[in-house]
Amino acid sequence: MQDITNGRCGWCGTDELYMKYHDEEWGKTVTDDKTLFEFLVLESAQAGLSWITILKKREGYRKAFCNFDAAQVAQMTDEDVERLMHFDGIVKNRLKIKSTITNAKLFLAIQKEFGSFYNYTLSFFPDRNPIINHFQSLSEIPVSSPESDAMSKDMKKRGFKFFGSTICYAHLQASGFINDHLTDCICRNQKQ
């Protein structure tokens, strides 16, 4: 894989959906809890799969999980799980579907405790600011960080599923808490 493809971080390749995601979302700071919940759902679903697989099913996940409304997802029942096991728009993994419902309940508890999931996430960053890395090569980008290690450890302790340090790091990248756009990427100097 090339470090830079068409001026972008090489991981997004030339797939139009992937490039659009890279250009318009990945690494942009997200402060909205609904969007943070969306990324949490999608990143958790990605465990063991490629991100493009989940990205292509994003609209299916949106329909399946109440437009990513955590309060509604938290109310889902075993009947909803059975229904979603037959829904073509998502990866049909019972454990991941059930964990999404559990994670929604825990997400709401964190909002109550910290005022927002955004505030909770910032609590793992010593100066409460996003990290902007200056990597020149994809091989320099780590799969985890002290922040993702601490956050995933705390989330696991709270009962979250499918959210280990690597998934947490991907979540932090996606939502702009860690900016890993390569220094030569076209998105590098854009306003976040």
Model-derived segments and their meaning:
Residues 1-192:
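HhH-family (HhH-GPD) DNA N-glycosylase catalytic core used in base-excision repair
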